[in-house]
Swiss-Prot record:
SUPFAM superfamilies: alpha/beta-Hydrolases (SSF53474)
Name of the protein described by the UniProt record: Carboxylesterase/phospholipase LipF
The species this protein was found in: Mycobacterium tuberculosis (strain ATCC 25618 / H37Rv)
Chain positions listed as propeptide in the UniProt record: 1-7
Pfam families named in the record: Abhydrolase_3 (PF07859)
GO molecular function: carboxylesterase activity; phosphatidylcholine phospholipase C activity; phospholipase C activity; triacylglycerol lipase activity
Keywords noted in UniProt: Cell wall, Hydrolase, Secreted, Serine esterase, Stress response
Gene this protein is translated from: lipF
EC number of the protein: 3.1.1.1, 3.1.4.3
Annotated motif Involved in the stabilization of the negatively charged intermediate by the formation of the oxyanion hole, positions: 116-118
Temperature characteristics of this protein: Optimum temperature is 35 degrees Celsius.
Entry GO CC: extracellular region
Amino acid sequence: MSSYYARRPLQSSGCSNSDSCWDGAPIEITESGPSVAGRLAALASRMTIKPLMTVGSYLSPLPLPLGFVDFACRVWRPGQGTVRTTINLPNATAQLVRAPGVRAADGAGRVVLYLHGGAFVMCGPNSHSRIVNALSGFAESPVLIVDYRLIPKHSLGMALDDCHDAYQWLRARGYRPEQIVLAGDSAGGYLALALAQRLQCDDEKPAAIVAISPLLQLAKGPKQDHPNIGTDAMFPARAFDALAAWVRAAAAKNMVDGRPEDLYEPLDHIESSLPPTLIHVSGSEVLLHDAQLGAGKLAAAGVCAEVRVWPGQAHLFQLATPLVPEATRSLRQIGQFIRDATADSSLSPVHRSRYVAGSPRAASRGAFGQSPI
């Protein structure tokens, strides 16, 4: 059992299916660590990735071959017995991942919709395969990871459309909202929260949200002014200048009603009907700002929000599973949260008439196949 230090008392079950949060404040827990392996991983990130981020931030106006990152990660082969299937969406693809022993995505049980990070400009199912494979096992669930369109060629709105299409694909398989957990890391945390808010317009409420080292606010200033900008093992301050420029350029290319796409800030639209939310974040990274700000806004609105802070780790240290013990521990905790959040949902497939081919909604989103996967 992991040890931790709670900044405030923890409810016996933490955040689960409850729509309320204890006395309107988020639960925040500081985990033990870092281990020697965690320290070494953070040092390696500081010595290699952070300098590359610094150089890349100066070269951001140039067309950088960022798609190579996910392509190169194809060498990370899935573990023995892991099943990966490519799913075609209207404007993108996704990969359905099942760890050994996990049932097919047939509308029964639970399912995780995973939105990868990478500053909206890079990465994909291959770069995040270790996290997704492990999460499928710990959550005892299929995981659908979306290879959404990236900026600056496409806009954030287009990326969110792809995530929404993936959610509709799961609904077409027979999953009900209370069987679906939205999860994302870094920029994928932004997409997970924004998707949950878009689903509110359809009166759909997923079982829960999981955000790992999440970027929840596009505004760069608060992060650049945060004390952790000096201790972050991955992001230099200038990286957020580059990200802001990329996002603006992408929005300008996507005209909506004759004007550039509006930039959407999810934290400005928090409502009490959002699902319970679990956030894992490093205590040394600058995105601790977004994690704590987001949890505070959720809790103030009456949404159960829990933050687990991991001291001394690199951004998205979960990628280092199983080499870093805290990475495995974090993913195991997330898997337990997902199982708890979906424990009350019925495990039988449901009527799919709203989503069958030929219905107005299916026609507008594209028809999806129904074969077992």
